[in-house]
Amino acid sequence: MKSSASLDALLVRARIASGAPYRYHIVSHSHENRGGRTFDLTTETDGLKYRAKSCSRGLCTGFYFDGDRSFDANFNDTALPLSAQVDGLQITLRAIVSYEFTAPNFRIIGGQLSEREPVLREGRSYRRLAIAPFRGSLLDAILEPKSGLVVGIVSDERKYAFELRDQRKVDGKITLPYEIALNGTVVERFERRAIENTPLEEPVGLVPTFAGGPETIAMTKLVRASEQPVVPCSIGGERVNCLLDTGNSGLSMSLELAEKLRIEPRGGAFNVSGLGKYVTGIVHAPALTIGNATYPGAEYVVLHDLRPYGYDVVLGADAFARARVTIDYPKHTVTIAPSGPIGPSDLFPPSNAVAISFENFIPITTVRLGEQSVPLAIDTGDESTINLAYDYYAAHPDIFKPSGSTPVSGIGGTSDEITGDIARVRFGDYDVVHPKIGATKSLAANGKGHLGSGFLHHFAVTFDYGRSRLELTAMPGDTNVRAVP
């Protein structure tokens, strides 16, 4: 085992040889082929921050790591966290690749470093360091002993090994690998890498602007009986109905509206999944106004079977991510307000707050169904009360006893829903007694099913995606809802 003086000397060599990339905003470009299509890849690093964008025919999706948590980003650059937890693995990967583990203050701020037995590769001995930044996972970095450059990242526990190959000078200041392999397979081959003088920017998404204070909007009453939150809106000079749908991962519009606005699909085929599946296109539509909130022009998925439901636009994750949206079911109103900056007061959420996570840009919360805790998607676009994925219900048939079945329809197709009721559902700090419950075959569910507007109609619900929570207020005098002591 090497002495601490030897380890310190190695860290100095590594910092000098690499040029300390953690001090710079680095932009890299590459390409990859998937499914017969070519994608332009752009990756950016700035200290521990990391951003990746994959683009084809002008449409991009991506990934973002803010130094603590990881986020997925959709076509409209809306980013939502993959988990509420700190991503310890990303922290350590970024600390090694950026050489932040060589920074003089790395151990002062809580990072841990120790040297393990050297490894032999093709007859050569390499130094092996166990590295764990503050709040990071433990990974091993393999260093070339003379220069100190990182040539590998290894996790025996996770059974993977990265190789950092083809090390080159970038802009005369830093040394970076141009090829990265995982378990022997090349996963990234950079064509260009450069230092950018401006800071790395986080994904912004669609930030609404407001003409005055928050405005209360009356819901539109549909011809059919429905608790769905549908409100009037305008886009491209057309007045249409918009559904506020937390079960939608972005934005959608009817084929009829796209044709009326004379906007053509671009970016190739897009797969739509609901009760069925089909392939459609994506259009770029102009700004949309709802109440006194205006969202900028954006990408919309075109749905050919949307208009019969009574609306032409579906406002999903993109409309919720950068605003506070209150759907007051008892009063049949919607209010959209600025989300506001996150500050120290957010460490103490209101008493009626319910934590949410996200799966495919859909909010998920844990609900107590009888005696079972079940993660369910909060889906304002689903007309049902509680709609379980059939596979989950088949594995847990004791949740409810079926009393009938009914045909259901949705985007992409039709199905059958087994129906019944359940004695009690715990949602946040409320018990809802004897709500309807069902299980639908072929339901493309997030979580283990959906809480729909048929259940949410007991409450005024404020969705605050930026704080990963919703806030519940029960309708006064509702005998089916009981506050939990």
Where are these regions (language model features)?
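A short, amphipathic edge element
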Residues: Y24-I26, F101-R116, Y160, G281
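A cross-family detector of function-defining hotspots
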Residues: H31-G35, R116-L120, V272
